Amino acid sequence: MEPVIAVVCCLVLSTGLVDGQSLEMEPIWLTVSSLYRTPIQGAALIDREIQLNWVEGVEEVALFTSDPTFNQTPVVRIKTEDYPEGMYQSSYSLARPTLVGGWELDHPGPQESGDHCLNFWIGSYRNDTLEQVECLKIRPTWMSDNRLSIGGLSLTSLVWPGTHNSGCYRRGDTLSQRDTLARFVLTQDQDVWSQLVYGVRYIDLRVGFYPPKRWNSSEQIRHESSLWINHDLIKVRPLVPVLREVRQFLEKAEGEIVLLDLHRFPVGFSGRHPRHNRLVELLERELREVAVEYRGGWPSLDTLWQNDPRGRVIITYGDNEVVKKHSWLWPPVRQQWGNQQTVTGLEEFLECCMNDTELRDSRRGLWAAMAQLTPGQMDLLFNPKASLRTMANTVNSKLTGWLRDRWWQQANIVTSDFFLGNNVVDVAIAASMEKGNAFKRYELM
């Protein structure tokens, strides 16, 4: 047994990873509230308000609307001791910012690689001196930017930042009264293109099939009009435009890899297996050229980049019989859904997932921690103030800390509602880099 003990000790010393160790990150960050409010004057709803966040030990934080390294006049400055929860919500709205660096959907190009700050910064003060600065940013090319660090990680070792029901977002650039009525339908406030630009790499879709009401001679049009993105039994938006956003992103962000999970088919597919053929035909037309071939196993990112240079999207499909027929479809992601109505219940459920070594066995494939609450019957029927927005607000304020301090070494895919309300994208990237660098240190032994 002594040689085995020596190897384990050497592995810990060489990688520097210690189980249960908190991930080292900047102690301040910005998030965007999932809530909205009605102004005292005017009819337009106010949403996407900026939140300042910090960890213990930070004395003062401030919000800036321009880079404080050039302009040190904050619009908000507070003492953290007055806000023991570690978060302060401002009245400044992100609104619909320009995705700088050429990352607007309709921008002809070229696009600039790297991270890009939007129009809000947070700074921390100690003894009246500005110590640290962070911005709210987009991270459209984070995988290729950090290729040397993360390339050795397998798909099951990388930490993938994701969204839940990714296609269920609001209909316009501004929040409408109609959107607010969909209290338990809309789960995001960014379209799929923007989710990818911010750094999300796992897109979760549920597809419904609705036979066309009127006959059309074009079979292509009939297929397109029949396939919708659903939230359970409710259809939200057509599928094709979302697939094209994924394709456009992959064409502009070379080197990025996206997990596209067609996870469930809640309407129109049960007992009608030929309809899967229509969906697969559509996927083949829209994404086959950039789809990664499934060759068994869960390879490293470097292997994908080297062996499948055109492949940029891993399409996982929630029907194993369909997967067996197509070399470019991957087995389903194992979503871990707690069906919890309280933050404590969700935390305990996810803690069990993170400690489940059988679940996390890399040979079993990709798995996702679904970090969102489920509304109960009482909420649906008798609580007019309850919504997915309010539930996301209670979870998102905790989720960043859970992942950063306890789960970053165990997690594979982490999804959330209204993802800008947490810092999961940044934590997932930092965790992947730390794990990748540790793997490289071990290889160099």
Residue ranges and their predicted role:
Residues D19-Y198, P211-K252, I257, E321-K325, ...:
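Long, acidic (Asp/Glu-rich), low-complexity accessory segments flanking structured domains
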